[in-house]
Amino acid sequence: MYQINDVIVYENGGVCKIADIGVPDFVTTEERYYKLQPICDNGGTIYVKLNSNKVFMRSVITKEEAENYLSEVHELEEIYSANDKLRDKEFQEAIKSCEFKRCLQVMKGITMERNRRNKTGKKLNMSDDRNLQRAGKLIAAECSVIFDISIEQAKMKIQAAMGAEE
C-alpha cells in the first residue's frame, strides 16, 4: 500500500503524487481511494480504488536504475515493427505498461526510424509521432521526479542519452 506524498506511475495518468487516501465525497460506500495529482497536470485529480486489481500503479524507479537505463540506451533493443498495425499495438502495450525500460525502447525505435526517414526527406507517420510523444512525456515526468529537475531538463537529459543513437 502506498502512503500520502508517495510518487507513483499510474497507467492512465502518468507520474502522480498521492495527495490523499480516504473516502471521496462522491462515493456512497465506505470504499477508500487514492487521490492522485498528476505531476504534469496542475489541475487534474484522479481517484483510484485502494484495492483495485484492474489498475496498474508502481513506484518510480530509483535514480540508479534510471541512470543505468539512460547510460545504456544504446544497448537496449528497440521496439519497432515494420507492420503498422502490429507496431502501434506494441507501442500501446509498452506505454500502458508504464515500464521505464519499455518506454525507452519505444522511444529508441521511433527515434531510429525518424532518423532513417529524415535522411530520405520523409517524416514520421502521425501514429509513430504520437507514440513518441506519449512515451517521452511519461519518461520525462518520471526522470523529472527521480533527478529532481524540471520537465524540460529531463527532456534534455533523455535527448542527450538518445543522441548517442544518432
Q: Each predicted region: which residue ranges?
A:
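Charge/polar-rich, low-complexity and marginally structured segments
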Residues: 51, 55-166
